[in-house]
Amino acid sequence: MLCIGDKIMDIDNIFSSLIKEIGYQNNKTVVINKVVMNSKEVEKNNLFVAIRGGNAYANEALEKGAFVIYDDNTINLNSNPNSFLVDDSVKFMQKLAHQWRNTLNIKIIGITGSNGKTTVKDMVFQLLSTKYKGKKTEGNYNNHIGLPFTLLRSEKNDDFMVLEMGMSDFGEIELLAKISEPNIGIITNIGDSHLEFLKTREN
């Protein structure tokens, strides 16, 4: 079982199609206090998701007492009981974030558009923060990696999240929407951004 805060997810059943090898025994409950992607931020009982070059820091994260999701089977973690070898770390985090979202009793506002996403996101967050507790997308964490990571940083006492959704290719907004299942959607505008990928404004 995987426990993040007070929420419990059956990691074996939900992610059986992605997990290649689980170091811990099936009867053990894995308790996570935070999800991180930056190896420099890793602390004990964090879940370190190794993405791209992050696999090289898997052993370092384990030494700090973290649990590790990694997708490079050439790395020798010596069957460490806190390690999870998966097919794809990004897809694993996306599925984990979606499952986590379904445990949250919060309102999620998704914001997209060719321009103005960040400004509108910040305005909505500031407005809601005068009365409620919540979180928003930080920096450029508005893609297929950043959005699920942001979702996984939410806390049990949050009332809302404002998620910025970026797009650079076909189907990206659909993917982000499926992961986060926003209650409210805001489109700032539809312009000529990313035409090098999308070809026409209609797309």
Q: Where are the regions that the model predicts?
A:
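Phosphate-binding loop of NTP-binding sites
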Residues: 91-203
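N-terminal leader/targeting and accessory segments in enzymes
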Residues: 2-95
